[in-house]
């Protein structure tokens, strides 16, 4: 796996699924391929994206700044600086300085990532802030190692919380999660339908599912009643994909 592929993988792992994720993936691909060279416009676009947390925006801004060539005098962006200040905690800053000194001795991406993984997310963000604010310099490879270590820690905590939700025994949360999944699956079916012959059928199934979810939310139902809805919808989607010749990896 090439270095940039690895960076893209880690960065995308912390972004919530949806149309915005696809858009960011495309931007990253363009930046890494040298197709997008307007850092100013890129940062302005990033700043106004909804949904993303300030830290995620800070990490993306850091990656764009590392990758896109720019004039030396280009201003640093406040939204990135604020996100990478370790919540203003002096402990994070102290640890960030210690980490920075260690990173200065590293020359490889993997070496830097290994060193960085033993620090907290706050310290890692502060260390990125040091480099972003030009208070310290490391090689691009080492900076990418720091980025990937930070993303790995964030993705780990997201995965833990996701697993807790999936394995929860609370029937109300499970019920709501099934309905949300049914809605998202319906949306995916509508997007995939396009102008194919089977489009009308897909749209009809998706429309029925949406109405069902709306009705369930309006009148309230027993928490187990949504299990069949989600499963039926997933089966319909998979059957539709087979006819379309589209094979999506386990869409769940």
UniProtKB/Swiss-Prot annotation:
Positions of region (RNP-binding): 165-252
Note: Most abundant protein in virion. When expressed alone can form virus-like particles in transfected cells.
Region spans: Membrane-binding: 1-164
Classification of source organism: Viruses, Riboviria, Orthornavirae, Negarnaviricota, Polyploviricotina
Subunit composition and interactions: Homodimer and homomultimer. Interacts with NEP. Binds ribonucleocapsid by both interacting with genomic RNA and NP protein. May interact with HA and NA. Cannot bind NP without genomic RNA.
Protein name, entry field: Matrix protein 1
Species this protein is from: Influenza A virus (strain A/Gull/Maryland/704/1977 H13N6)
A GO cellular component annotation in the UniProt record: membrane
Annotated GO biological process: viral budding from plasma membrane
GO molecular function, one term: structural constituent of virion
């Amino acid at each position: 796996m090439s270095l940039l592929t690895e960076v893209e993988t880690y960065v995308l792992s912390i972004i919530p699924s949806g149309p915005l994720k696809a858009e960011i993936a495309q931007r990253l691909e363009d930046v890494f391929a040298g197709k997008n060279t307007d850092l100013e416009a890129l940062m302005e676009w990033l700043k106004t994206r909804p949904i993303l947390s300030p830290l995620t925006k800070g990490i993306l801004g850091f990656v764009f700044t590392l990758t896109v060539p720019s004039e030396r005098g280009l201003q640093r962006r406040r939204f990135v600086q604020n996100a990478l200040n370790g919540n203003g905690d002096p402990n994070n800053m102290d640890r960030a300085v210690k980490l920075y000194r260690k990173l200065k001795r590293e020359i490889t991406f993997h070496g830097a990532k290994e060193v960085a993984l033993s620090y907290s997310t706050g310290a890692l963000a502060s260390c990125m802030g040091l480099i972003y604010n030009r208070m310290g310099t490391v090689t691009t490879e080492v900076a990418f190692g720091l980025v990937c270590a930070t993303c790995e820690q964030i993705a780990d905590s997201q995965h833990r919380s996701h697993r807790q939700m999936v394995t929860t025994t609370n029937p109300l949360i499970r019920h709501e999660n099934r309905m949300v999944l049914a809605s998202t699956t319906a949306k995916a079916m509508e997007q995939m339908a396009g102008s194919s012959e089977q489009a009308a059928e897909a749209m009809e199934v998706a429309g029925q599912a949406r109405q069902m979810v709306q009705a369930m939310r309006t009148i309230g139902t027993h928490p187990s009643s949504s299990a069949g809805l989600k499963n039926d919808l997933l089966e319909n989607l998979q059957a539709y994909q087979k006819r379309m010749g589209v094979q999506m990896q386990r869409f769940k």
